[in-house]
């Protein structure tokens, strides 16, 4: 495996057609880790409720992954940024630590809310953690995800929001992992989901506090 990102069968980045600025940013980030030519741009599904658009976009990718019989698929959001000096080394060591673990979700970064559980030196067992800016789905979770969201037209309750569902349901029932140290966060910029400028510095601070 020349590049640790070869661990992932396919890599997608969700990007709204009108956010050319975000796509240019994302390509620069992908170029840093040698995957610019591998990342497939997924035209984000636009909804008045951006949270619903994120769900439908992820659902579209997961359905593609199942159709293509991919063992796993890595999904980025277009505001992702690599926050460590050696992301390829971090990812490589974390993947080595996975070994034969039957994981379902594998995060490169997350908004953590609890003290983090290190199951190996470079691997965290993730619980009660949010955000979906850089996350891989394993094939064992495709059907669970599709069953939850297929045909969704609106969000009826808070627990239907994508990262809330993953944190409260999937992370509680399945093996969900994150690299250690966390290697991605999100840039501070205008969010089409939140409809305002968002500062994501708190994600990095929470990780520092929760990994102690």
Please provide the spans of the model-predicted regions.
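An acidic/histidine-cluster motif and surrounding catalytic segment
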Residues: 1-76, 80-212
């Amino acid at each position: 495996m020349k590049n640790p990102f070869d661990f992932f069968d396919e890599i997608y980045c969700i990007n709204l057609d009108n956010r050319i600025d975000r796509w240019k940013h994302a390509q620069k980030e992908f170029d840093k880790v040698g995957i610019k030519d591998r990342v497939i741009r997924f035209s984000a599904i636009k909804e008045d409720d951006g949270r619903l658009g994120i769900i439908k976009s992820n659902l579209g990718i997961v359905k593609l992954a199942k159709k293509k019989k991919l063992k796993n698929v890595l999904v980025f959001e277009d505001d992702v940024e690599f926050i460590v000096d050696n992301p390829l080394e971090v990812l490589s060591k974390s993947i080595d630590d996975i070994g034969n673990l039957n994981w379902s979700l594998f995060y490169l970064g997350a908004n953590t809310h609890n003290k983090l559980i290190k199951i190996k030196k470079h691997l965290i067992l993730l619980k009660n953690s949010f955000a979906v800016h850089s996350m891989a789905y394993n094939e064992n979770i495709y059907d669970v995800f599709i069953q939850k969201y297929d045909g969704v037209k609106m969000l009826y309750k808070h627990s239907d929001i994508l990262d809330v569902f993953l944190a409260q349901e999937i992370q509680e029932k399945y093996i969900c992992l994150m690299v250690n140290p966390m290697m991605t966060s999100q840039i501070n910029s205008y969010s089409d989901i939140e409809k305002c400028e968002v500062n994501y510095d708190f994600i990095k601070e929470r990780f520092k506090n929760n990994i102690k």
